Amino acid sequence: MKFGHNAIRVKDIDVMLRYYVNGFGFEEAFRIFNDDSSLRIVYVHISNGQYLELCLGGGDRPKFDDAASLGHRHMAFIVDDLVKTKSELESRGIVFDSDIMNSRDHNLAAYLFDPEGNKIELVQVGSGSPHAKFESH
């Protein structure tokens, strides 16, 4: 079994597509339509069979400000070089909510929010992290 997609409900598909395609460099893969031919879902290809599913029909959402709330907290993307990736994304207009930091799991991390408030983490896996140790066993 492997991870397939993360689905997020969106209000403005055009803004979100520009953000993830133009900003992050991901590729729009395909679209799914309703019976009345209206757009329902846009799949954005991330890597190796992994997608971000942008589902139309989002309303207002509460601001993410309660780390103790149950449910989805953030989505994370693994990068090889966080300093380089952060710089490239910033050159494309992506704004970060944090500087690069050392996380408790011995990785480098930086956080940002997409235009509709979904929290994103970029992670550079450290050689001494539990992630690296687990993957190497």
Regions found by a protein language model. Name each.
Residues 1-17, 72-77, 126-137:
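N-terminal beta-strand motif that seeds the catalytic metal site of vicinal oxygen chelate
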Residues 8-51:
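Core segments of cupin and vicinal oxygen chelate
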Residues 38, 71, 106:
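Exposed loop/turn and edge beta-strand positions of beta-sandwich/beta-sheet ligand-binding modules
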Residues 41, 76, 109-110:
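Short hydrophobic/aromatic beta-strand element in the GNAT-like acyltransferase core
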Residues 47-51, 59-60, 82-84:
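Short, charged/polar surface micro-motifs in flexible loops or helix N-caps
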Residues 75-78, 82-89:
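Mid-chain, well-packed structural core segment of small domains
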Residues 86-137:
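Vicinal oxygen chelate
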